[in-house]
């Protein structure tokens, strides 16, 4: 989107936020992540990046149905080192688009809060003076995608056009979420994992191939060493349902995000159970 000045951009952002019933900060964050994603799609690294995580889920179900502040990707064809990732993102920042936004890499660090896959966190700034928006991109490698990544058509927030980017298929997104919820059991402190499973299945469940999802879950659990959840999921769900801590976390999530206000914790657990019963033979 071409804007005359930062004030006009802020006006567009404010209007979109009102339309979607979400904060202007969230819309600005997603707009700048979109600007970065378009640069990736136009760079020599287009076929090395695979979009996943919250930003992809938001694109699938709608920004007003799932908010996110970061970009999650997996990379193929490169060894995951600080030096390689810094060069890749420095190159991406030089891609010129008529949107008046300039990007800079401000930091590279290891992702330490999860051991699912090795990862690097890239800190960037999106600058449209005086607007400056800090961004985070998480990059992993070795992700188990079943059967393979897909070409995803990503619609722009403001422009009536689309870009093409490689992404996780729906079944792999769901498989990773199911594995996370069940393997971490009551130790999982992220209500959004439950929400993501529920909303994806509610809105896109008919598009989900059950055999592919079963294979994706089996491969994901094998990779993560959590195969026991395939047979123990009913007992695990019983513990989850009875957890006061998880229920309190869910209620807090419902209060914070308007799009979750009509969904109970029991609803999300029922969705997990329904999916598992449908795919576990």
Predicted regions and their residues:
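Catalytic metal-binding/acid-base residues of hydrolase active sites
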Residues: 56
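Structured mid-to-C-terminal alpha-helical surface segments
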Residues: 1-49, 59-67, 71-281
